[in-house]
From Swiss-Prot:
This is Protein BIM1. Residues 127-146, 163-173 have a biased composition (Polar residues). It is found in: Cytoplasm, Cytoskeleton. GO terms for molecular function: microtubule plus-end binding. Keywords: Acetylation, Cell cycle, Cell division, Cytoplasm, Cytoskeleton, Microtubule, Mitosis, Phosphoprotein. Residues 126-173, 292-312 are annotated as: Disordered. Residues 147-159 have a biased composition (Low complexity). Residues 6-107 form the Calponin-homology (CH) domain. GO terms for biological process: 2-micrometer plasmid partitioning; cell division; microtubule depolymerization; microtubule nucleation; mitotic sister chromatid cohesion; mitotic spindle orientation checkpoint signaling; negative regulation of microtubule depolymerization; nuclear migration along microtubule. InterPro entries: CH_dom (IPR001715), CH_dom_sf (IPR036872), EB1_C (IPR004953), EB1_C_sf (IPR036133), MAPRE (IPR027328). Gene3D superfamilies: 1.20.5.1430, Calponin-like domain (1.10.418.10). SUPFAM superfamilies: Calponin-homology domain, CH-domain (SSF47576), EB1 dimerisation domain-like (SSF140612).
Length: 344
């Protein structure tokens, strides 16, 4: 028999499909790790084949198969490095070389016992020659002992033999029923594990979505807080008389422009505090926001409207400055204010 090294893909696929009763068309299909696991199981017969996923499609399922394979290598002291990260990519060359090595190992260590791949995929225990001869070894001393008894003992022994024979038949029936139940339970367990894996994937996707939404929420919340700080700062400056333009513009008295800035600020404030129908403010969130504002002086200002001293700087971080400052330090109202009542 060939050692397997240097064999063509056709020869290897023929050997693999014949050994495991599969229908692989390409060497790359071995990249899932399932076939590798069953090749080792055909040698040692101790792999948990119910956990091996032959219909694996996700990378985490491939990883599960290779963990089972590596456990087998460790258990039997096989010194072979398995490059899982290369094999799971299902590339031809990597899987060809590993399959060649596996066939060589199989030729060296496989005994003459018959291997049933279909039964093992359903996780039926392999019956070896040693296990088949064990009942005979146990029964021989008993038979010899009974043959040396007296006539009365022989009669009793005959009755016992009949009973033991009957128990043996019932026991074998009970064992076969237990095996059937075991296969059904293992199939159900495999299905449950697949469902759990699918649900875990969905959970990871939802976590990513929630993380993105939280980032967006913080981004827009900070913008609204900046606008709120700007509105309150402007109102304070108006009330303190910091603005050096006539009172008619500020208060709306007389025949002038009439409180354009103040009306604008009030409109912005009303928009900020407007709520949808059925919406209730959360007092806990308000207290938290006030606490954050008190600790840091102001909420981080993305628009550059107010510094930590409450001073307004309209020349940083905004393309639509509402409050402007001239070279002499005097504060003025921008001509870009929206004051048309219909706009609101």
């Amino acid at each position: 028999m060939s050692a397997g090294i240097g064999e063509s893909r056709t020869e290897l696929l023929t050997w693999l499909n014949g050994l495991l009763n599969l229908n692989y068309k390409k060497i790359e299909e071995c990249g899932t790790g399932a076939a590798y696991c069953q090749i080792m199981d055909s040698i040692y017969g101790d792999l948990p084949m119910n956990r091996v996923k032959f219909n694996a499609t996700a990378e985490y399922e491939f990883q599960t198969n290779y963990k089972i394979l590596q456990s087998c290598f460790s258990r039997h002291g096989i010194e072979k490095t398995v490059y899982v990260d290369k094999l799971i990519r299902c590339k031809f060359q990597d899987n060809l070389e590993f399959l060649q090595w596996l066939k060589k190992h199989w030729i060296r260590h496989k005994d003459e016992s018959v291997y049933d791949p279909d039964a093992r995929r359903k996780y039926r225990p392999i019956i070896t020659n040693n296990s088949a001869t064990k009942p005979r070894t146990v029964s021989n001393p008993t038979t010899a002992k009974r043959s040396s008894s007296t006539g009365t003992g022989s009669a009793m022994s005959g009755g016992l033999a009949t009973r033991h024979s009957s128990l043996g038949i019932n026991g074998s029936r009970k064992t076969s029923v237990t095996q059937g139940q075991l296969v059904a339970i293992q199939a159900e367990l495999t299905k449950s594990q697949e469902t759990i894996g699918s649900l875990n994937e969905e959970i990871e996707q939802y976590k990513g979505t929630v993380s993105t939404l939280e980032i967006e929420r913080e981004f827009y919340f900070n913008k609204l807080r900046d606008i709120e700080i700007l509105v309150h700062t402007t109102q304070d400056l108006i009330n303190e008389g910091v603005y050096k333009f006539n009172d008619e513009t500020i208060t709306g008295h007389g025949n002038g422009n009439g409180g354009a800035l103040l009306r604008f600020v009030k409109k912005v404030e009303s928009i900020l505090y407007a709520t949808a129908e059925g919406f209730e403010m959360n007092d806990g969130e308000d207290e938290l926001n006030d606490k954050n504002l008190g600790e840091h002086g102001t909420v981080p200002n993305q628009g550059g409207y107010a510094n930590s001293n409450g001073e307004v700087n309209g020349n940083e971080g905004s393309n639509h400055d509402v409050i402007m400052q001239n070279d002499e330090g005097e504060v003025g109202v921008s001509n870009n204010l929206i004051i048309d009542e219909e706009t609101f």
